[in-house]
Amino acid sequence: MNLSPVLRLLYRGPRGAAPGVVNPYREAFPELDGPRAAQGRRENLEAYLERVEVPRLVLLGEALGFRGGRFSGIAFTSERQLAGPAERRLPWGGSPFRATSRNPALWLEPSGSIVWGALGGEARGALVWNVFPWHPYGARGPLSNRTPERGLVTANLHVLERLLAEIDGARVLAVGRTAQAALAALGVAAPALRHPAHGGAEVFRRQLRDWTAQPMRASSRSSTSPSLSASNLRAK
């Protein structure tokens, strides 16, 4: 499994005119981002992917949020979960992960806390991603979120398509209808879990538990399949 082509597309994108969209892996705002912020987010993402090893479960959300992946570099994950106080961090947080924002308190995303709580905080085998893997913001500015327009999602499905080709055999679950529709456009039928935001936490937890308890067809990936190792992650 080689995610280098996926990361190259991710770091380069998005395609087309995309006003109100930040690619946090190559862009930074001086008033919001700390030193070498974009590089730090790339490094955070690649370190996380190494911890995933071989994905067996993929949770696909909509887009990066400003309290989460916009500054952490990882979907459904906040700075505080990576680089905050030890009691607030995920079990796999700490070094080499780092915060990239100028927020002294570090950003914390409620949805990310719910998702990782439902996953038991375990990164191994669990890949979190977004169908639009950058940060679209609204009229209130860069510290806001918006749903990416359908045309914008469609124009950038090549990133998701390449990712899915590399992780064939994993169970794919959509978090919300936008993610489900994007998967359907690629010919992938996936159940839509209730998004944990806006009161959906309990339903999300129950649906995730129910779906992961169901047997799935044997993966085509053999026990010798390459994991997401450092050599397979470099975006050249």
Q: Where are these predicted regions, by residue range?
A:
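Short, flexible loop segments at boundaries between secondary-structure elements
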Residues: V188-R217
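A polyanion-binding, active-site-adjacent surface
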Residues: N2-R171, A179-L186, P191
